[in-house]
């Protein structure tokens, strides 16, 4: 008779940081302002349309989402970046997804 390990529970990784719709909209609207300022001439001559501001109410109505958990909140909310700042890792290091999977598996055990 052989013995094998079985994970009988479930684990769910939840990132430690969260972004509210209000925070996301403030960042997005700052990006809109930067974009419109940088492209003022093209907007004025009609070659491109100006971007418009969003609102927390619009996001909630369109998606039903009030807040989201994220990795690297600062990078996402930076209007010059608007994406997580996750440094590239060498192939000898575990990936971010691997770390998340291990954290979830440890919760399940």
Predicted regions located by residue number:
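Conserved "HGTGT" condensation-loop signature of ketosynthase/thiolase-family condensing enzymes
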Residues: 1-109
């Amino acid at each position: 008779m052989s013995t094998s390990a079985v994970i009988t529970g479930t684990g769910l990784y939840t990132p430690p940081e969260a972004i509210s719709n209000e925070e996301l909209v403030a960042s997005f609207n700052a990006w809109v302002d930067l974009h419109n300022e940088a492209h003022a001439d093209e907007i004025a001559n009609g070659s491109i349309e100006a971007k418009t501001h969003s609102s927390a109410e619009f996001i909630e109505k369109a998606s039903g989402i009030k807040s989201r958990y994220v990795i690297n909140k600062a990078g996402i909310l930076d209007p010059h970046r608007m994406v997580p700042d996750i440094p590239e890792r060498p192939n000898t290091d575990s990936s971010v997804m691997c770390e998340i999977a291990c954290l979830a598996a440890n919760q399940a055990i």
